[in-house]
A protein has these predicted regions:
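Conserved alpha-helical substructure of the radical SAM core
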Residues: 5-123
Length: 123
């Protein structure tokens, strides 16, 4: 099985790469987490990246599902004070529970913001 053996030089290069890759994985920091919380929109912009419609035929993700992912998959691995949660879509202001979502994210220690066209703002 001499075909499986590699030379010392290649072995050292692979070990070095492996160490560098592991260090890179350890150093990677999550700074921003985008939640595309709706595909609904009150406009139909041609230039926008998401396929957004007034009624896209897809239900919005329930807040509880997002918070479960945040609690179980994100929070154990980050300092919430160092991560910005960004609500995006579609148009986030079409969600009637957006204020509750923001309050729940804040209660968990995260800062948050949103991407909006602003048409739903009244004050």
């Amino acid at each position: 099985m001499s075909g499986l053996r590699i030379g010392l030089r290649k072995r050292l290069a692979l070990d070095l790469f492996s160490d560098l890759y592991a260090a890179k994985v350890r150093e990677h920091r999550l700074d921003a987490l985008f939640w595309e919380c709706t595909l609904r929109c009150n406009l139909s912009c041609r230039h926008f990246g998401s396929d957004c419609r007034v009624d896209p035929g897809v239900r919005d993700m329930p807040i509880e599902d997002f918070l479960k992912v945040l609690d179980e998959e994100v929070t154990p691995h980050v300092d919430p004070a160092q991560v910005l949660v960004i609500f995006s879509g579609g148009e986030v202001l079409v969600r009637p529970d957006l204020e509750r979502a923001g309050a729940e994210v804040t209660r968990r220690g995260y800062a948050w913001g949103m991407v909006t066209n602003g048409l739903g703002l009244t004050e």
